[in-house]
């Protein structure tokens, strides 16, 4: 097996970062004709812009898992499509708040299988106390595992120390 990875990151103007990537896995382990198979590959692109205390970001990624039978149907995944957006604001040197929204869509090969998008919304707050940072994140998930009404909520409180 082998894999090829390509990526490009550029900062064309002050505050703007653009990135793109692609990977492809070459699978040689079974010794048979793989010409009809779907090989694993994926890619992503993203943009981030910072101006003063405000930062916004947007990204999209795709992943096609390896599949040995293109017309399997049923629940054989053709590809996943993920989209993320975020905004962060540094209120001052010690306090920052941010919001993130992510969506993941599953696409099946040749079936009528219904896939429900996974959706995630998260709010984060961090406060610096000199050598320590206290942070809290509240995240709501919908349709975990691409299953309808499989929802959850997480709250994470963390304290990190610099030594």
Which residue ranges define each predicted feature?
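Outer-membrane beta-barrel proteins
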Residues: 1-163
């Amino acid at each position: 097996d082998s894999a090829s990875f390509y990526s490009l990151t550029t900062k064309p103007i002050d505050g703007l970062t653009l990135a793109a990537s692609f990977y492809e896995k070459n699978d040689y382990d079974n010794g048979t004709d793989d010409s009809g198979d779907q090989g694993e590959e994926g890619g992503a692109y993203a943009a981030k812009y910072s101006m003063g205390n405000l930062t916004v970001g947007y990204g999209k990624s795709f992943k096609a898992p390896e599949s040995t039978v293109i017309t399997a149907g049923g629940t054989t995944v053709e590809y996943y499509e993920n989209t993320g957006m975020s905004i962060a604001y540094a209120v001052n040197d010690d306090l920052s708040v941010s919001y993130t929204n992510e969506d993941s869509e599953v696409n099946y090969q040749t079936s009528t299988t219904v896939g429900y998008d996974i959706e995630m919304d998260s709010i984060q707050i961090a406060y610096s106390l000199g050598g320590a940072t206290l942070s809290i994140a509240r995240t709501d998930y919908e349709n975990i595992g691409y299953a309808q009404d499989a929802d959850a909520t997480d709250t994470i409180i963390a304290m990190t120390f610099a030594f």
